[in-house]
């Protein structure tokens, strides 16, 4: 429901970071702040608590982050506190990362195999998909012995499942339909 709003916040912050040449710095700082919010229970409770005033929450953020992060980024966080959206910072970060990938003409993908890929196999797969999508692709690799063999590739919403496990499932489904 708030995806559009998250994207607008993220785009505004991205444009500020881009003008300052600090996109990577902002992204890294946001990741660390999200981890702090998500992993520090006391901090989370303070910023979540409805009886702690917005003013006190802002003072807390200023005392923690002043001189540690860029002023514009701190101002952004204070706006989120003001709008009661700070607990949804992760969504803004996710959108900002998507914008960054779009600007860099890059997609994310995953390659799953039953055994680790050799570097030349990985390079060949990456080259094939970069040509197909005409974009750079950042692949994560994962070894899943349950696949038995073959390769599973997902780029965006596109999936190519050429694993032994999927072929066995297809044969099983076909045999069950014939009964």
From Swiss-Prot:
Keywords: ATP synthesis, Cell membrane, CF(1), Hydrogen ion transport, Ion transport, Membrane, Transport. GO terms for molecular function: proton-transporting ATP synthase activity, rotational mechanism. It comes from the Bacteria. SUPFAM superfamilies: N-terminal domain of the delta subunit of the F1F0-ATP synthase. It is a peripheral membrane protein. One of its GO terms (cellular component) is plasma membrane. The keyword Glycoprotein does not apply. It holds the Pfam family OSCP. It is found in: Cell membrane. PROSITE patterns: ATPASE_DELTA. InterPro entries: ATP_synth_OSCP/delta_N_sf, ATPase_OSCP/d_CS, ATPase_OSCP/dsu. F(1)F(0) ATP synthase produces ATP from ADP in the presence of a proton or sodium gradient. F-type ATPases consist of two structural domains, F(1) containing the extramembraneous catalytic core and F(0) containing the membrane proton channel, linked together by a central stalk and a peripheral stalk. During catalysis, ATP synthesis in the catalytic domain of F(1) is coupled via a rotary mechanism of the central stalk subunits to proton translocation. Belongs to the ATPase delta chain family. F-type ATPases have 2 components, F(1) - the catalytic core - and F(0) - the membrane proton channel. F(1) has five subunits: alpha(3), beta(3), gamma(1), delta(1), epsilon(1). F(0) has three main subunits: a(1), b(2) and c(10-14). The alpha and beta chains form an alternating ring which encloses part of the gamma chain. F(1) is attached to F(0) by a central stalk formed by the gamma and epsilon chains, while a peripheral stalk is formed by the delta and b chains. This is ATP synthase subunit delta. It comes from Clostridium botulinum (strain Eklund 17B / Type B). The gene is atpH.
